[in-house]
Amino acid sequence: MILTTTPNIEGKPVLEYLGIVTGEAIMGANIVRDFFAAVTDIVGGRSGAYEQKLSHARQIALNEMAEEARRLGANAVVGIDIDYEVVRDGMLMVTASGTAVKI
């Protein structure tokens, strides 16, 4: 399965557009991790705990989207957009969407 943010794949014409596909992941926050992330932010540096959480949520959303595309008979997803949003109570939502295609 080819996944790309571009609207097409160079050298590979789209044979069929199969529709919009999406994937979502909602991850909860951890109070202890939040505390240490805040300390990291105060003293400078990167928050590894949050980076791991974001990476994991993004991968879940992309995997769900790719699986939906496979069910439609696609072998690629083009025009992928990934969005991040904090929802109530510190929950993090990551969504991935794109167009399932046959190339």
Swiss-Prot record:
What SUPFAM superfamilies does this protein's entry cite? YbjQ-like
| Cysteine-cysteine disulfides | none
Which residues, if any, are the signal sequence?
A: none
InterPro entries given for it? UPF0145_dom_sf, UPF0145_YbjQ-like
User: What's the superkingdom here?
Assistant: Bacteria
Q: Which PANTHER family match?
A: UPF0145 PROTEIN YBJQ
Give the family from UniProt.
Belongs to the UPF0145 family.
Protein's name in the database: UPF0145 protein PTH_2690
Organism encoding this protein: Pelotomaculum thermopropionicum (strain DSM 13744 / JCM 10971 / SI)
Output the lineage of the source organism. Bacteria, Bacillati, Bacillota, Clostridia, Eubacteriales
